[in-house]
Amino acid sequence: MPKTLTEKLNAIKATGKGIFVPYIMAGDHEKGLDGLGETIHFLEDLGVSAIEVGIPFSDPVADGPVIEEAGLRSLAHGTSTQALVETLKTIETEIPLVIMTYFNPLFQYGVENFVKDLADTAVKGLIIPDLPHEHANFVEPFLADTDIALIPLVSLTTGIERQKELIEGAEGFVYAVAINGVTGKSGNYRADLDKHLAQLHQVADIPVLTGFGVSSQADLERFNAVSDGVIVGSKIVKALHQGEPIQDFIRQAVAYQK
C-alpha cells in the first residue's frame, strides 16, 4: 500500500495542478520552536501541498547563505532535534510534513528512536541530503513498517541507470536538484535541464519535484511545465524572517494549472 505522502501528491497531480512544497527552518521564528505550529498553519491555510521542515545543523553543506543563516538563528534560539520532535507531537495539521536533516543530527538522536518518536505526528517524509544511496540501509529498515518515505535526491549529473537505481522502490516524490551547488542560487541552470527532468519522468512512477534555486514566477512556470511541481526554500525562509509579504507568490504557486 502506498505511503500517505505518495497518495496525497499523486492526488494533486491527478487534478492537473502543480505540486507546491515550501521549505521552512524549524525554530527560525521570534518564538523559536513555539512558533513552528503558527508557521505551518499559515502555509496550510494558503493551500500548500506539503511542507519541508529543516532541522538546523552547524555544517550544512547543501545550504546556501539564506538557509544557513536561518539554521544559525534557530540554533541560537535553542533548537535541538529532541525539542523539535517534542514540538511536532503537539502540532495538528492535515498537511504532510517532510523532515530535511543532515545525517549527523539523526545519528546523534538515533535513527530508530527518531522514527519511532515521529510515528504519531504529521511527518510523512524524510530527506537526508548527505546520505549516499549506498548507505541508505542505515535508515530504510527503520522506515519499512512506517508511513514515512525516504525521499531520493537526483542531481543533474546523474545518468539514467543511476537514476533508476536511486528511484527504484522510492515513495513520496523524487527531489530533482535543479542546479549544481547549494540552495538559493537562482537562474544559472544547465541547458540540458529540461531534458534531464523529462528523463526522470520516464523512470519515476512517483511525482518529480524540482528544487534548489527556484525563486521567481518565471521559475514556477518553467519547472511546473517540465516536472510535477516545485520546492521553494530560500525565498520563503527570507520572506518569513524579514516579515515580507509572500502570500501572493504562494497562492500563485498553489493555483498553478498544468
From Swiss-Prot:
Active-site residue numbers: 52, 63
Enzyme class name: lyase
GO CC annotations, alphabetized: cytosol
Coiled-coil segments: none
GO MF terms, alphabetically ordered: tryptophan synthase activity
Catalytic activity entry: (1S,2R)-1-C-(indol-3-yl)glycerol 3-phosphate + L-serine = D-glyceraldehyde 3-phosphate + L-tryptophan + H2O
Entry EC number(s): 4.2.1.20
Pathway: Amino-acid biosynthesis; L-tryptophan biosynthesis; L-tryptophan from chorismate: step 5/5
Quaternary structure (record): Tetramer of two alpha and two beta chains.
Family membership noted in the UniProt record: Belongs to the TrpA family.
Designated name of the protein: Tryptophan synthase alpha chain
Organism: Streptococcus pneumoniae (strain ATCC BAA-255 / R6)
Higher taxonomy: Bacteria, Bacillati, Bacillota, Bacilli, Lactobacillales
